[in-house]
Amino acid sequence: MKIKQFQQMMSMVMMLVLVAFMTTSCSKSDEDTDGLVPISKEVNFYSVTITPTIQNQKMAQGTHTVMLETTNNKKQVRFHFENFNGRMFESNGKLSENQFMPFEVSVDMILNVTSNKDGSVSFKSEKGTFKAKPKDGKPIDMSKLPEGILPPNLNGFETDKAQAEGTLKNGRLYLVLSPMILPVKIIIDSNN
């Protein structure tokens, strides 16, 4: 438990360093930068709430640890997490105690980084993979799928066309991810 608290504290300290770095690296005209900007920390872990949605309706939700790490000479970040499996929402709008998503989801993306004059950082995906595999390795039972979802394969599926956009502001990571294979948007928020 103390290790997790230490990691969170170190993440916050590094975010303050990042914000300080960004404010000193603004252009003289103080306008948004058009190019990529360096990121000051090699690796950051975030405890986030992940919420898959269909047409703005929450389908499932859970907490998970995601990682941002610098790449391409610190001008891009790699965003990734593995084996997320949140609890499903019931018809009454509450999270189920025992019904979980039929798939475990893993995401790996390269995000371009832009520094904004308000001190925030914007992310937009350059490329990304989205993988969904059945929990416990068994094919999915059609009766356990959320209404409106018919995956391309009940034994699991993946795509290299996933996209994401988002921001990092005042230590809050917020991304909207689209697998581009299902009519799903996945909200990733470190400040819920």
Task: Provide a role label for each language-model segment.
Residues E42, T71-N73, T167-K169:
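Solvent-exposed loop and beta-edge segments used for protein-protein assembly and interaction
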Residues S11-F21:
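Bacterial N-terminal signal peptides
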Residues K2-V13:
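Bacterial N-terminal signal peptides that target proteins for export
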Residues F45, M59-F157:
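Predominantly extracellular/secreted and cell-surface proteins with exposed
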